[in-house]
Design a protein with these regions (language model features):
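Catalytic alpha/beta core domains of metabolic enzymes, predominantly
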Residues: 110-111, 124-200
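Active-site beta->alpha loop and helix N-cap motifs at the rims of alpha/beta catalytic domains
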Residues: 1-126, 136
């Protein structure tokens, strides 16, 4: 009612995921209210979730934006103790070129030693990261380990899966296309509905 973060509900959700053997938690992703949180709220959420999980399962932390310098600054200066990897969305609204997307992720890769999961969701960002750009990033930066693919373009996803480096995974970013994507060779999903039905 007062528009503050319901931290108690968040902890109940974390406990629910742990009780139902979720493989890992994605914290501060873009499906949540992350874009409307203050920096202090984000830091508190990160701290609370890391403490609650206490190393039981890996934590994938959302660190992205359309201001490359701000993302790099966050990666260089924030404390990432307890974070296993970061999820970083394609820059939104600005509609960068494919070379611009590449340079954005190059800067991110060089700013951290943490594993990086790319996130392509053109329906939200306004620009699609093409297969050739994804593959170029995957080949050039060893700490880029996967992509959360939510373009909805099965041909594009299949192209990535067929041509990716061995140490790079494709993860579905859309519950509705998870099964066909797994049949092509994707390794799983970062799920929305899994928040409500983690066991299923």
């Amino acid at each position: 009612e007062d528009e503050s973060v319901d931290y108690d509900a968040l902890m109940r959700l974390v406990d629910y995921q742990l009780q139902n053997n979720t493989d890992f938690l994605c914290v501060l992703g873009t499906t949540a209210e992350t874009p409307t949180l203050t920096e202090d709220e984000k830091k508190k959420i990160k701290k609370m979730v890391i403490e609650r999980v206490n190393g039981k399962i890996p934590i994938l932390l959302g660190v992205g934006g359309n201001n490359t310098r701000a993302v790099v600054d966050t990666l260089k200066n924030d404390d990432f103790t307890g974070v296993d990897a970061i999820l970083s969305v394609v820059p939104y609204y600005n509609k960068p070129s494919q070379e611009g997307i590449y340079q954005h992720y190059k800067a991110i890769s060089e700013a951290t030693e943490l594993p990086i999961v790319l996130y392509n969701v053109p329906g939200r960002t306004g620009v699609n990261m093409k297969a050739e750009t994804t593959l170029r990033i995957a080949r050039d930066f060893k700490n880029v380990i996967a992509i959360k693919e939510a373009s909805g373009d099965i041909t594009q996803m299949d192209d990535i899966i067929k041509n990716k480096p061995a140490n790079f995974d494709v993860i579905s970013g859309d519950d509705g296309i998870t099964f066909p994507l797994i049949t092509l060779g994707a390794v799983g999903i970062i799920s929305v509905i899994g928040n409500a039905f983690p066991r299923e």
